[in-house]
């Protein structure tokens, strides 16, 4: 007798989405989560007398997904706030800044002030990139199969296909340099694309990162009211409203497999939960290498391939804290009188290194060292959402830093690196910003490993090109099914990848439901 029809392991937003769709379809589902609450890296937590987002607070791609309506998330409390400008793109040398708006015309108007020589280049870029971005979004929404790809392409009258295929083979730098003369125009796109993925922008296969600006013009970025965690909170309510079950503080030890079929999930405390279908919404490397004692014959080649892959290491950290006054960036004097109509304190500030310093940062990462000009994404969540103010009424900040390798030379325990990042961030501001910080904390890769059960602090990502995806390479990641009957993979490590997107969870649920219907 099974305990449920399906078990979803991992309560991050993709696991929650998958579970919610299954429960909505009438599938008896148990969600298993190692932590004492769901949400994963999309969580908002209480600490230091304030609420902090675990990772980025800006949500974009998920707002293009039908799941918000299909799971009735607005009814369950999800409400997005939109900053007047999405990003301020800044640089360590404190010049060349520019402002990015969701509206393309506003962005172009701003560039005519800050980078007039790049205006025509940006228009030419959008003319080419918008159709590619539209196609990429449709593929992500519909799933990775050749018939669905052709259907999406037909709906667009085949517009953008040739560039999508060409860009998917190229590097991000190659594509960007086809349009922009000034690296200040393209480095912010690299900072939120290949750098976040941990890949050099010169690497072949990173070219679709160049759609980043076009995508943000198509889909408005927003922040959930009361923090990023309002998203998983709403999904959880949707899931529970349809009879879903949750087991918290339940750490998975291994999967039980019999006759090439998944049979049960064995927990560290010795409890066993049985179900004919198991969806692992977590690091696929950990699932396939550490949770399966003896690979059944049909899965031996798959398991062997994953065993040969090194266990990936995390490279991102985040500082959170409370500040007495809003920061005054040095770029504000550069933009003074030109963008007074925009409340720039609401925007995320991307502080990018030069191309040369980024190359150096990649080399240092491999040596367990950290650049003196790291990529930084800074935000003041309370400037847009008063409900994110600290209990004492002061503002809160978040600062993401890349690269900060898990295998840091000297280790993280006694490291002074987080203090150094605050100093580097402060160099981008007027006055003594460091003295304005009353409390702060550091989420480094070792902390992500300890508190969020992320092996080596690593957040997985999906890196295959669209072409490789469409022809079905690494089918366990692109099609979500493994050779072990009843075992599926989902989450950030599966198509179409990481970030607050929700497409992996949605598409996996569709795949599982189709398999259940056909069984």
Summary of predicted features, one role per range:
Residues 239-252:
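A conserved beta-strand/loop element that lines the FAD pocket in flavoprotein oxidoreductases
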